[in-house]
UniProtKB/Swiss-Prot annotation:
Keyword line: Disulfide bond, Glycoprotein, Glycosidase, Hydrolase, Signal
Protein name as annotated: Fructan 1-exohydrolase
Activity regulation annotation text: Inhibited by sucrose.
Cysteines joined through disulfide linkages: C444-C490
Lineage per the UniProt record: Eukaryota, Viridiplantae, Streptophyta, Embryophyta, Tracheophyta
Pfam families referenced in this protein's UniProt entry, alphabetically: Glyco_hydro_32C, Glyco_hydro_32N
Active site: D73
Annotated family: Belongs to the glycosyl hydrolase 32 family.
């Protein structure tokens, strides 16, 4: 094992990194679309040009992406009549935000996708400014209905409904908008007309009425506004929100679903919820997706969190990296709840114009409640494993302080890696400072993989160049707080690329782990060129990262290592890695390709 820790010398981090989803403003140019200013941005990429090297170098092989142009939020995913549907926010005209419609793709396995034409376009007075995020609810009798936010002619946010034009069409390619759109307007006292969007999937209450929540601002509070309906067409606002909070920005993309402790399956909101079930309320805020666990009080018609936490920095997160606007759905095919999110580009708008595309969706994940009922766990859907090939295995490795073990014989730029780290001793854990919970990213940046600890850092180095000038580190550190153990998981991108014009933070999150009972900490990392998704501790912390290393231009040169830089020895009882084959994603090749997994 090489002793090559010079590559992990401390990195000076110039300037401050600020996670920000506000998109840049473009000046007028000959590329403007001339739509009367309805687009948020007007610059568009030249059409029909040859793909740039960056377009092919950074484009993923098995993540959900549009063939070209801008995409953002997942909207209205569902399983219907044997087919998975993924709708998404999409710009038909270029790789920047604007002119938003609902893209539409279909699949039989959640991995290979056929792109169809747009399901919804902005062609009425209630959505002329954009067909924005929404959900699908399947009504009794197997009738799917879309409810979505539209930007109306006055640039107010309103809620609209659409139905399939022909339910006998297995792909539901055409949708008809309801004649009474918009079905909801932000016209009640205390509502903000430009902060009223992203309706949830509907559910039926004990009184037999439909309910749904819409993200909004009410009297200056962030809220999941609650509405009722008998027929899903005519809605009445309930006099109190499902839940609200006075200490955060407007909640985008709320999601509300039932979970059952000790059950890693999903629960269908349109069916009776079993005794003992809890509910999760997710909101997209502060550029991340956060959530609370609690109960749905049927008498009060309100969500009641198990723990009321005023400081939203302490709210749990779905993902601690570049992940936003997630949407879940109940998969009746396999009795599970699936969630995925939007991972934006972290390069520059000019890069996106050169690439001709921007944005992707994370790998679909199963999501369920941990046995202790305190947090959600996530794991990639099993279907992704159909892309695995060329498996390599190592058992019985031992990593002492400063050790690197190179993982060879897989395509390290397009791989799935599962590794168990077993701690020889837990006596050397450094003390934990609870204030670190307020900003785990800051702590990851302060300690880094080059700073030895009692237990850790240990983990993976991925997408590393020959001289280690470029590399990304995904690793753990173990701390002790009284009789508990806290594990820090980091995905450090600060040396992921030599380019200076990128966002290169050190992402991180903490999870509590009973090391006295279980000495193994698992790590799974999916590497797909510019997208890296990591799952720590069985899905207790998930981190999505976007990276743009030059080493991807010569993919055979990318290296991957298991490492330990802590004082305590770490054993690796099992390390498995696979090369991942390319999926068919939004490329028209006919249905035979996705019906026969052997052809992918």
């Amino acid at each position: 094992m090489a002793q090559a820790w010079a590559f992990l010398l401390p990195v000076l981090f110039f300037g401050s990194y600020v996670t920000n989803l506000f998109l840049p403003t473009y000046a007028s140019s000959p590329l403007c679309s001339g739509d009367g200013g309805r687009s948020f941005l007007c610059a568009q990429a030249p059409k029909d040009k040859d793909p740039s090297p960056a377009s092919t170098m950074y484009k993923t092989a098995f993540h959900f992406q549009s063939a070209k142009n801008w995409m953002n939020d997942p909207s209205g995913p569902m399983y219907f009549n044997g087919i998975y549907h993924e709708f998404y926010q999409y710009n038909l005209n270029g790789p920047i935000f604007g002119d938003i419609v609902w893209g539409h793709s279909v699949s039989t396995d959640l991995i290979n996708w056929i792109g169809l034409g747009p399901a919804l376009v902005r062609d009425t007075s209630s959505d002329i400014d954009g067909c924005w995020t929404g959900s699908v609810t399947i009504l009794p009798g197997g009738k799917p209905v879309i409810i979505y936010t539209g930007g109306d002619i006055d640039q107010h946010q309103v809620q609209n409904i659409a139905f399939p034009k022909n339910r006998s069409d297995p792909y539901l390619r055409e949708w008809i908008k309801a004649a009474n759109n918009p079905v909801l307007r932000p016209d009640e006292p205390g509502m903000n007309s430009i902060e009223f969007r992203d309706p949830t999937t509907g559910w039926i209450g004990p009184d037999g009425l439909w309910r749904m929540a819409v993200g909004g601002e009410l009297n200056g509070y962030s809220a999941a506004l609650l509405y009722k309906s008998e027929d899903f067409l005519n809605w009445t606002k309930v006099d109190h929100p499902l839940y609200s909070h006075n200490g955060s920005n407007m909640w985008e993309c709320p999601d509300f679903f039932a979970v059952l402790p000790g059950n890693n399956g999903g629960l269908d909101l349109s069916a009776a919820i079993p005794q003992g079930a809890k509910h999760a309320l997710k909101m997209s805020v502060d550029s991340v997706d956060k959530y609370l666990i609690g109960v749905y009080d049927l008498k009060r018609d309100a969500f009641v969190p198990d723990n009321v936490i005023d400081d939203r920095r302490l709210w749990l997160r779905i993902d601690y990296g570049t992940f936003y606007a997630s949407k879940s759905f109940f998969d009746s095919n396999k009795g599970r709840r699936i969630i995925w999110g939007w991972s934006r580009e972290t390069d520059s708008p000019s890069d996106d114009l050169e690439k001709g595309w921007a944005g992707l969706h994370t790998i679909p994940r199963r999501i369920w409640l941990a046995d202790d009922g305190k947090q959600l766990l996530q794991w990639p859907v099993d279907e992704i494993e159909f892309l695995r090939t060329n498996e390599i295995n190592h058992q019985g490795l031992e990593l002492n302080k400063g050790d690197l073990f190179e993982i060879k014989e897989v395509d390290t730029f397009q791989a799935d890696v599962e590794i168990d780290f077993e701690l020889a001793s837990i006596d050397d854990a450094d003390p934990f400072d609870p204030s670190w919970l307020l900003d785990p990213e800051k702590h990851c940046g302060e300690v880094g993989a080059s700073v030895p600890g009692g237990i850790g850092p240990f983990g993976l180095v991925i997408l590393a160049s020959d001289n280690m000038e470029e590399h990304t580190e995904v690793y753990f550190r173990v701390y002790k707080l009284q009789e508990k153990y806290m594990v820090l998981m980091c995905s450090d991108l600060r040396r992921s690329s030599m380019r200076p014009d990128l966002e290169k933070p050190a992402y991180g999150g903490f999870f509590e782990f009973d090391l006295a009972k279980e000495r193994k900490i698992s790590l799974r990392t999916l590497i797909d060129r510019s997208a890296v998704e990591s799952f720590g501790g069985g899905g207790r912390v998930c981190i999505t990262s976007r990276v743009y290393p030059a080493v991807l231009a010569d993919v055979g040169r990318a290296h991957m290592y298991a490492f330990n830089n802590g004082s305590a020895t770490v054993r690796v009882p099992q390390l498995s890695a696979w090369t991942m084959r390319k999926a068919q994603v939004n490329v028209e090749k006919g249905w035979s390709a996705i019906q026969n997994r052997g052809s992918i």
